[in-house]
């Protein structure tokens, strides 16, 4: 026997049954899905075992480790100086006066007075170079002078670097790239002699450099040709007497250093040098396309009638 159903509930059931028979509308919803790309592996940041440098030094000291002190310095190698310390002043009229004349004796007296500073410098140089002697050095300096100038004939710059300093090298090879040099040594008119010696420090007093000025009175030949073989300066078959004061330098602190040619002292009373011969191109006459140079030259040589 069925139980009675209340009126309100029966109407509710009928209503729900009607909605259940209706078609269901499905709506499309937008869904955002995050896609991860391949990320680069980043290792974790290591944590320092010692927070401060002081703790690290204390631990190293206990472990018996010696940590050298870090110096923010960069080594600089100075192979030569940039000039002459105390330039020698050649006496006026040198090599022209006799040593027995009054002027010659005066020059020798002044040279002896200035010799005191040179003696102190010689003692300083001998502390680093025990074999340095003023009697033997002039011949050695003359050999260096001759060999350095002969390197210009063959353009042997590698050998020239060992004979001259970095200060003297540009002065010797300047403007000789496309030229031919013919230099020759004939003879010595007077024995080479040391006239000036100086010793000084660069940057500090422990970095010592020695400079020796040698007087060379020689006879030489010199000729310079351009790249086309035309003579620009001098003559190969005409020797000339040359008086030069050459400065030689050495880095005394370098145990493997050697004496090299550093500079030349040119006195104010020295005669002027021979000018360089310059060749110029003289432009010819302007010709028309149908004219020839021989025809115009022949026309120019025709006599003009009055």
UniProtKB/Swiss-Prot annotation:
Q: Which UniProt keywords apply?
A: Mitochondrion, Ribonucleoprotein, Ribosomal protein, Transit peptide
Recorded hits in Pfam families, A to Z, give: Tim44 (PF04280)
GO MF term set = structural constituent of ribosome
Q: Is DNA-binding among the key words of this record?
A: no
Q: Does the keyword Transmembrane apply?
A: no
For biological process, the GO terms are: mitochondrial translation
Q: What is its main location?
A: mitochondrion
Q: Which GO terms describe its cellular component?
A: mitochondrial inner membrane; mitochondrial large ribosomal subunit; mitochondrion
Q: Where in the cell is it found?
A: Mitochondrion
Family per similarity comment: Belongs to the mitochondrion-specific ribosomal protein mL45 family.
What function does this protein fulfil? Component of the mitochondrial large ribosomal subunit (mt-LSU). Within the mitochondrial ribosomes, required to direct the nascent polypeptide toward the tunnel exit and position the exit at a distance from the membrane surface.
The annotated subunit structure for this chain is: Component of the mitochondrial ribosome large subunit (39S) which comprises a 16S rRNA and about 50 distinct proteins.
PANTHER family found in the cross-reference section? 39S RIBOSOMAL PROTEIN L45, MITOCHONDRIAL, LARGE RIBOSOMAL SUBUNIT PROTEIN ML45
Write the protein's name: Large ribosomal subunit protein mL45
List the source organism.
Mus musculus (Mouse)
Q: Please name the gene that encodes this protein.
A: Mrpl45
């Amino acid at each position: 026997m069925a139980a009675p159903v209340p009126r309100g509930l029966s109407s509710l059931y009928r209503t729900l049954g009607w909605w259940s028979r209706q078609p269901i509308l499905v709506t499309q919803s937008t869904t955002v899905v995050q896609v991860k790309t391949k990320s680069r592996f980043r290792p974790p940041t290591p944590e320092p075992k010692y927070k401060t440098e002081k703790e690290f030094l204390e631990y190293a000291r206990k472990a018996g480790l010696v940590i050298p002190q870090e110096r923010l310095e960069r080594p600089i190698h100075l192979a030569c100086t940039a000039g002459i310390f105390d330039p020698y002043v050649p006496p006026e009229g040198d090599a022209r006066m006799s040593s027995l004349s009054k002027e010659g004796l005066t020059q020798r007296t002044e040279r002896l007075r200035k010799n005191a500073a040179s003696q102190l410098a010689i003692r300083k140089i001998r502390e680093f170079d025990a074999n340095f002697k003023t009697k033997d050095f002039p011949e050695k300096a003359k050999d260096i002078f001759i060999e350095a100038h002969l390197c210009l004939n063959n353009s042997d710059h590698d050998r020239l670097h060992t004979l001259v300093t970095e200060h003297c090298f540009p002065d010797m090879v300047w403007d000789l790239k496309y030229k031919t040099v013919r230099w020759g040594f004939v003879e010595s008119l007077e024995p080479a002699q040391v006239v000036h010696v100086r010793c000084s420090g660069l940057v500090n007093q422990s970095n010592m450099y020695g400079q020796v000025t040698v007087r060379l009175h020689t006879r030489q030949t010199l000729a310079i040709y351009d790249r086309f073989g035309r003579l620009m300066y001098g003559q190969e078959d005409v020797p000339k007497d040359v008086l030069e004061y050459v400065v030689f330098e050495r880095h005394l602190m370098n145990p493997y250093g050697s004496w090299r040619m550093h500079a030349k002292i040119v006195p104010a009373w020295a005669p002027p040098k021979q000018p360089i011969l310059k060749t110029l191109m003289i432009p010819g006459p302007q010709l028309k396309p149908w004219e020839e140079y021989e025809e115009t030259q022949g026309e120019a040589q025709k006599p003009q009638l009055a």
